[in-house]
Regions:
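A residue-level detector for the "anchor" residue at the start of short, highly conserved motifs
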Residues: 1-239
Length: 239
């Protein structure tokens, strides 16, 4: 169930999380909205000066109410996304951060950077050199080390398909696809080895339909599915 409570770090921060297979929409004090994917947790900390969100794990879509005097900051992994009024998707999976801009502008900087000049739309001469500014349709991908790259033409419909109860994979590494599928089902999938985790998976699946996903892997790749007593399924390379 969705829970909202004071986080242990500070009484000012509200903590929300969704369970496996559960999605919810939060409406914040300024009418900004956060759509939480399954198995997702966020901290929400609003102050008179800033709107601060930490994505602890999972995925969320942010529809930010405009407030030029109060930047909206979302920290995930090693990155912070700064917005004034916009819509964007942020995902944290396997220590990688994915930021997809749907409309407006955002600036992406290293987590913990509270430089007040780091806001979208300012003169680029005022921005630190490591700040990336995104335009609609772009996706930033940052690895565990913080190194990032920008995809200039991301497929917004595919990336946000989770909001419609679908997962749309296009040559997705199986390891990442498994992490995403596991948000929606208590049948936990595990890649048997790195070679299996690197397989490129394509297709559209209903969220939570783990059996159909495993069946597709068996048909197209000939993998072996080992079913454990605890309900998990280990995906092994073809025999």
């Amino acid at each position: 169930a969705l829970r909202g409570a004071s986080a242990p770090e500070t009484k000012l921060t509200q903590y929300y999380e969704t369970d496996i297979g559960e999605t919810r929409v939060l409406t914040l004090a300024d009418n900004s909205k956060i759509s939480l994917d399954a198995k997702t947790a966020v901290d929400v900390d609003y102050t008179p000066q800033l709107r601060l969100i930490e994505l602890r794990h999972g995925q969320a879509f942010f529809d930010v109410a405009k407030d030029p005097t109060r930047p909206f900051r979302v920290t995930a992994g090693g990155k912070t996304v700064v917005a004034l009024g916009t819509a964007f998707n942020v995902e944290l999976v396997n220590d990688e951060v994915f930021v997809t801009l749907v409309e407006g502008k955002v600036a992406v900087t290293d987590a913990g950077d509270r430089n007040e000049k780091v806001v979208p739309g300012v003169d680029k001469a005022d921005l630190p050199p490591d700040v990336r500014e995104l335009t609609p349709g772009q996706r930033l991908v940052a690895d565990a080390s913080g190194a990032s790259s920008v995809e200039p033409r991301a497929d917004i419909s595919k990336i946000t398909a989770w909001r419609r109860g679908k997962l749309n994979f296009e040559d997705e590494p199986l390891g990442l696809a498994i992490e995403r599928m596991n948000r929606y089902s208590r049948i936990s999938l595990v890649a048997g080895d790195e070679k299996v985790a690197a397989l490129g998976v394509s297709g559209v699946f209903d969220t939570g339909d783990t059996e159909a996903f495993v069946e597709a892997l068996q048909v197209y790749f000939g993998v072996r599915a080992e079913r454990r007593a605890d309900g998990s399924i280990i995906i092994h390379a073809p025999a």
